């Protein structure tokens, strides 16, 4: 039979030391055969805790990203929030992807971050603007070329596994630009936990 330990007992001296963990309800739980130590990766754990978020912008086949056009997503996090972020970008043709920090932006469309745990009511401590006016790009932190190929069988790509830890109170600009010469489907997905 598992034993659940309340927080008040953490200061009690005991002869036995048993591993324990704090669950999503902030209850200290002793490890046992019925309650094994969770061993999921941190991203998976944050997802179940309701601390994983995402933002996605898609230019579908019916409304392709024009040649020379960009998807600009500006994001900043509240004081004390060091978001661990992963980006995923894909496009149907040649494209360039950049990340800038210390960007200065105005206007744009305020968009919500969505919780990746659809059962959680937790909200992100972020502010996101889609396609704002960029007055200062800031410092380039990352740059990547997404090759699309040539001819009728050309196709873009993406899907790296780069991850970043973002500083609080700093505006970051994520820019995906279609450099193919023709309109193409494109998307940018930002996922993070706080």
Give residue spans per PLM region:
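Extended, low-complexity segments enriched in Ser/Thr/Gly and acidic residues that occur primarily
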Residues: 1-121, 126-139, 144-145, 177-187, ...
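Beta-sandwich interaction modules
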Residues: 145-169
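Internal, hydrophobic beta-strand segments that form the core of beta-sheet-rich folds
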Residues: 166-178
